[in-house]
Amino acid sequence: MARFRGSNWKKSRRLGISLSGTGKELEKRPYAPGQHGPNQRKKLSEYGLQLREKQKLRYLYGMTERQFRNTFDIAGKKFGVHGENFMILLASRLDAVVYSLGLARTRRQARQLVNHGHILVDGKRVDIPSYSVKPSQTISVREKSQKLNVIVESVEINNFVPEYLNFDADSLTGTFVRLPERSELPAEINEQLIVEYYSR
């Protein structure tokens, strides 16, 4: 299944979550797109709620269904709560870490930076967005890429880095200190609904 490439603004409004991370999609019209706009009152079934939650998280991380399901299955083989393990695995993806460090303004930008070879892990170039970052590993920007406008501007406006990460803006180097806790990850996601969706 191909990655979704349609309007993120419409998709954000339909799902009720900012897929870009900027929140701009919901500022003027915080309701689903369509003819009836804010007057839509369609009640979702249990399956519909589960599907919507799955789609929210999948589109948030910009993953194909196969990538998303594979990560979900890997999380199920780990000790602990399946849903929480899943959220932690997603947050440990290289593109997610690059975004959380503030090197990109959106997750899509972060994925592109990785794809184009601008990001190093422990000093070695890694161009796989799904690469799973491990605690104590360092993430940095390739020297030739450090003056890219997208990176410079992102770092300038970013004023928050999660506690499970360390970041030095001068050297554009971050450290994945530890695995994140569930409370440090997107609160607008109910991962239990996703577990129920795949358990049907």
From Swiss-Prot:
Domain of life: Bacteria
Family: Belongs to the universal ribosomal protein uS4 family.
Keyword Zinc: no
GO molecular function, one term: structural constituent of ribosome
SUPFAM superfamilies: Alpha-L RNA-binding motif (SSF55174)
Cellular component, GO annotation: small ribosomal subunit
Function summary: One of the primary rRNA binding proteins, it binds directly to 16S rRNA where it nucleates assembly of the body of the 30S subunit.
Assigned keywords, A-Z: Ribonucleoprotein, Ribosomal protein, RNA-binding, rRNA-binding
PROSITE patterns: RIBOSOMAL_S4, S4
GO biological process: ribosomal small subunit biogenesis; translation
Domain S4 RNA-binding: 92-155
PANTHER family per the UniProt record, alphabetical: 30S 40S RIBOSOMAL PROTEIN (PTHR11831), SMALL RIBOSOMAL SUBUNIT PROTEIN US4M (PTHR11831:SF4)
Species name: Staphylococcus aureus (strain MRSA252)
Subunit structure: Part of the 30S ribosomal subunit. Contacts protein S5. The interaction surface between S4 and S5 is involved in control of translational fidelity.
Cited Gene3D superfamilies: Ribosomal Protein S4 Delta 41, Chain A, domain 1, RNA-binding S4 domain
Protein name: Small ribosomal subunit protein uS4
